[in-house]
A protein has these predicted regions:
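C-terminal, non-catalytic extensions of nucleic-acid polymerases
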Residues: 1-118, 343-498
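Nucleotide/phosphate-binding sheet-loop regions of phosphoryl- and nucleotidyl-transfer enzymes
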Residues: 91-95, 125, 129-133, 145, ...
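Short, glycine-/Ser/Thr-/acidic-enriched flexible segments
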Residues: 116, 126-128, 137, 177-179, ...
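Short helix/loop capping segments that flank catalytic or ligand/cofactor-binding pockets
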Residues: 119-121, 131-132, 181-184, 231-232, ...
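Active-site-proximal segment of RNA-dependent polymerases
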Residues: 122-174
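Acidic/polar loop patches that form or flank catalytic/metal-binding clefts of enzymes
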Residues: 145-147, 290-294, 317
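Conserved polymerase palm-domain catalytic core
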Residues: 166-265, 270-286, 293-308, 344-375
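A conserved non-catalytic segment of reverse transcriptases
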Residues: 298-342
Length: 498
């Protein structure tokens, strides 16, 4: 890929985008991105890493072979932790038992996107991911500093502008085809300073292994699975949109929550109607392909960040991926009821059928403030009219666990301090708990965690980081899930979150 400007305005856009990235990566003559900055934000994602037997933090960093694509990454890692005695001791222990490994790159796999389409994702080597997370955190910080975009809140702002655009046509929404796969190495090299480009090249995976075993060289800077992919593409598109605005003479408007007249979240882009055509033209210049079937600048429909809007109404449907666990059924019922309330379309037969999938001893009614997967959300008046008779029924059942019966008795005879407050209501709710393993007191006992080797310093560091709680190593939420019912209280049952 080569940037090939067709007219003078293209040159202006390229210059503005480069200027934005210079501001991001330089502080005057000083470099902003270095090992000290990256190491402060070292981290690992919730997914898998190459040659790791489990998904938890302790296993990946202190109980597995440390994989990387370049030996310089391990030397940099040792430099970063040399002044951290606890981490260094944990690494020396791990290295002596598990060793290190250089791999060619990532491993490609697929996860379902729809019933017909799967999304590709790459499993990264552990050390590559550690550095990618550090770089990604730096990019997120700069994204918020320069463009006031907070990735944790931006989807709400995207939907807000999409809603407004569906009412008065003032904003258009742009969807890109395979955006992350279209960020080529040459594009990034042309836009960002050389020293920052070298950091990205060092930490990325140069190739990936297909399910067939074939090794494929990657010409994109990073894939989905790389921790800096999402903030990097958000920065590129934010820089491009703001450059287009400046050239068109459109003022950039910012509020306390972020930008008010444009929005970027990954490849979800929203711009003013009068800037739409120029932004699309510049996206093509940068090598991106606009998905015209999902991009809208005319009519009353707008789509962004999971919101489908028509004339100011959210017409997004409810998608049910699975109903294999009772928590999935709770979620389906709650989302369908919300959709019915929003659309005015009643679905009594559908909801009644889903309700029938829930066992008679698992029908927990909960307030609107709780999560969709914890029970069925109902008005307070309905809950109070059914609670006593349902709890009496549970007390008579032999198949109801004793801890649930004790919770009912506790609520009725020995209310805890919060229940003594006026208008406070006790109720039972279901939470899904992932499988966890108790840490043995010494290295002479087994843990049960696959491939577990006792590493005292690694366990302590994991505990201090919040990855070990109550002496147990917890796996991902979707691994060996089990349900835990607990007694809770609320004084704001009917309050509906915004």
């Amino acid at each position: 890929f080569v940037l090939n400007p067709v007219h003078l305005f293209h040159d202006y856009v390229i210059g503005e985008v480069k200027s934005s990235f210079n501001d991001i990566f330089y502080r005057g003559p000083d470099l902003k991105l270095d090992l000290s900055v990256i190491s402060q934000e070292f981290g690992l994602g919730p997914g898998a890493n190459i040659e790791c037997e489990s998904y938890d933090f302790f296993t990946k960093l202190y109980n597995s072979t440390l994989t990387r694509t370049d030996d310089r990454l391990y030397r940099l890692y040792r430099c970063a932790i040399v002044d951290l005695p606890l981490v260094l001791d944990a690494e020396l222990n791990r290295s002596a038992y598990r060793g290190n490994s250089i791999v060619s790159g990532s491993r490609l796999s697929f996860v379902p996107k729809t019933s017909d389409i799967s999304r590709s994702i790459c499993t990264e080597p552990t050390l590559n991911m550690l550095f990618q997370k550090g770089i990604g955190s730096f990019l997120e910080h700069e994204l918020q500093r320069k463009f006031k975009i907070d990735l944790t809140k931006q989807p709400v702002l995207n939907r807000k502008l999409a809603l407004l655009g569906s009412i008065d046509g003032s904003f258009g929404t742009i969807d890109l085809s395979s955006a992350s796969d279209s960020i080529s190495i040459n594009l990034v090299k042309a836009l960002i300073p050389d020293y920052a480009f070298r950091w990205l090249m060092l930490t990325r995976s140069p190739c990936t292994t297909l399910p067939s075993g074939e090794v494929l060289r990657l010409d994109m800077i990073s894939s989905m699975g790389n921790a800096f992919t999402f903030p990097l593409q958000t920065l590129i598109f934010s820089s491009l949109v703001t450059a287009c605005y400046r050239i068109l003479g459109i003022p950039l408007v910012y509020g306390k929550d972020g930008p008010q007249n444009f929005a970027v979240f990954g490849d979800d882009i929203i711009v003013r109607k009068d800037a739409y055509s120029f932004v699309v033209d510049c996206l093509t210049l940068f090598g991106f392909s606009v998905n015209e079937s999902k991009s809208f600048n005319a009519g009353y429909f707008r789509e962004s960040c999971g919101g489908d809007f028509w004339k100011g109404h959210n017409i997004r449907g409810v998608y049910l991926k699975e109903l294999s666990h009772v928590s999935h059924v709770y979620s389906a019922i709650n989302r369908l009821i919300r959709w019915s309330a929003r659309s005015g379309t009643m679905l009594p037969k559908t909801v009644r059928r889903l309700f029938g999938y829930i066992g008679k001893t698992h029908r927990w009614f909960i307030p609107y403030t709780d999560g969709d997967t914890e029970g069925i959300k109902v008005p307070l008046e309905f809950f109070l009219s059914t609670r006593d008779s349902y709890w009496d029924y549970l007390l008579t059942r032999r198949d109801v666990p004793s801890r649930i019966k004790k919770s009912i008795v506790k609520s009725r005879t020995h209310p805890h301090s919060r229940s003594l407050k006026a208008n406070t209501v006790d109720y039972l709710s279901s939470t899904v708990k992932p499988k966890s393993y108790a840490i043995p007191p010494d290295d002479k006992q087994e843990c049960g965690l696959p491939g577990f080797h006792y590493n005292g310093s690694g366990l302590l560091h994991s505990m201090l980081g919040g990855f070990i709680r109550n002496g147990r190593i917890t796996l991902r939420l979707n691994e060996a899930n089990r349900t835990n019912v607990r007694l809770r209280s609320t004084s704001s049952w009917n309050w509906t979150p915004a």
